[in-house]
From Swiss-Prot:
HAMAP family: Polyphosphate_kinase. This is Polyphosphate kinase. An intermediate of this reaction is the autophosphorylated ppk in which a phosphate is covalently linked to a histidine residue through a N-P bond. It comes from Burkholderia multivorans (strain ATCC 17616 / 249). GO terms for molecular function: ATP binding; metal ion binding; polyphosphate kinase activity. Mg(2+) binds at R375, R405. The active site is at H435 (phosphohistidine intermediate). Its cofactor is Mg(2+). GO terms for cellular component: polyphosphate kinase complex. Keywords: ATP-binding, Kinase, Magnesium, Metal-binding, Nucleotide-binding, Phosphoprotein, Transferase. Signal peptide: none annotated.
Amino acid sequence: MSVRYPLLNRELGILGFNERVLAQAADPQVPLLERLRFICITSSNLDEFFEVRMAGLQEQIRDNPGAMTPDGMSLQHAYDLVVERAQRLVHRQYTMLHETVLPALEQEGIYFHNSDSWSDAQLEWARRYFLDELLPVLTPIGLDPAHPFPRVLNKSLNFVVELEGRDAFGRQAVMGIVQAPRALPRVVQMPQALSGFEHGFVLLSSFMQRFVGELFPQLVVKSCNQFRITRNSELFVDEDEITNLRVALQGELPARHLGNAVRLEVSADTPQHIVRRLLEESGLGEKDCYRVIGSVNLVRLMQIPDLVDRPDLKFTPFTASIPPAIANATTMFDAIDEGDILLHHPYESFQPVLELLQQAARDPSVVAIKQTIYRTGTDSPLMDALMEAARNGKEVTVVVELLARFDEETNINWASQLEAVGAHVVYGVVGHKCHAKMMLIVRRVMQGGKATLRRYVHLGTGNYHPRTARLYTDFGLMTADQKICEDVHHVFQQLTGIGGELALHELWQSPFTLHPRIIESIRTEIDNARAGKRARIVAKMNALLEPSVIAALYEASQAGVKVDLIVRGVCALKPGVPGLSENITVRSIVGRFLEHHRIYYFHADGAEHVYLSSADWMDRNLFRRVEVAFPIRERKLKRRVIAEGLSVCLGDNQSAWQMQSDGHYRRRRAGKTVRNAQLGLLAKFCS
């Protein structure tokens, strides 16, 4: 089916974002160890891309080969384009690592020792390490009729070994497989006295290639090659059939490691007959094979910056600030009573959010706490505070999203711990992931000489995750505004109970009012532009894909509305097309921190409506998730959001990329004055 207006391909857009991430590794202004980290981040992103998006594309081709993508391409054509671009990206990534980053690291005394250049002393150390630390954990599998090719785990490091000779039972040995357990280190530090470098490292693959013969005694090792298989990692839970989501999910999680293969990675020097065998065993074609120079898993190199104590090769450390309104208050409740508080992470600390919950857990006046959890990590002081509150007799209700991708197991564990201390745990609404970020605290206070209940709320654009709060840009609002607090109470009521849709005063909520309000706000700007009034839309988000929103934005451009979009990742809208979108610009900011806040600005004939949200403008966020968008009404806070969240990004000429009408991005070039959104905010807020 052809589309009525132009859209860009989602998968190609995701790869485009990863190209921008990889460009950070080529930027000489980025510290060297951080450049290595960006290469690793690209690998991690590609892993998820193959596990989810490519797996889905392959499934669609199998199930409905004649179907078309939303942008009007046949599935097979789209797949071919995506594979070609992914191959180019991987090649560029490894070329950058081996020709630029590793040589630069060597100049700084950080070196990876290859097994074919070990000295006698290094060889002896490596042999001892292999025999003592690796060999006892490894299990060789010889391939014969009694030992078929094993179904190796998703993203595990494996070695295929060509053998010659007969084993103890007289069987002719041809091939063996060794899977490296995840518990084994992928990078081992060589003693400095042996290395000759300040920081010398040996990859696990180097140990294996040199000593794998120890696993196959009295056989000749003809070759040893590493490989890695990526599998479909989407979980299937039939939401119409299940009676207990947590139990169903626990039964499904182990299968994630053994889903259908979607990608094979091999070292570039792997013999072709070995590659063919691996492809056959995996059910993959030649296009699905990625030949790389060196290690097949660069994600594990992410630990190198942490192992190397070289502050001069890393981003400058910073201390996030605490707003004076909080620093000067006796308690968080006193601070919020004085007025709404806006927090801009990571420039302002996430600690006040933790302190609000910790104080609530210990405050005898607090009677109830309600909290949503999407991602929070395996070691979370926020979850500790919720459990403390439950142990202290508070009415604690936690909406835990069990289907947060790749955090399912962590969230199941937290749900069990919360229930064990008496908290009420619910899993939201089946069929609608709860992605909204909400905290509601109910406290008994004295007012006019009598006790009354007062609500306090925290709403955010990002997760309740202390670690990512230092890595992602997000806004959070603390308020005791009666209407907002009542709205949050109603949303929790919907999530935990059963009943009809409740009217909200201030919040826009998906899957009910968020999409209609966005469309309505765009149409107001269209009407104002047609009436000769000033009209403007500025929106910042991670992704823009929803067709009816894109259609409305195209119509806005045609009506003369100036539209500036700041979309970090994939954007299906084509900007700058004459007669369609010449009044629309699309920028992407890629820098030290992951741009994560969602901000919607509508000029509204001078009223300037500003909303913060956890929702991207995507089908899933607007129709298949529980999300909220909340207004920033207080004038000073509104100016802050506009200035810190939007204006600095629109003015950035160092870390910003501008989308062209063909979907490709060009880096904005600095003029006489360099403007970097993130560095400017660091300088403003942090010490």
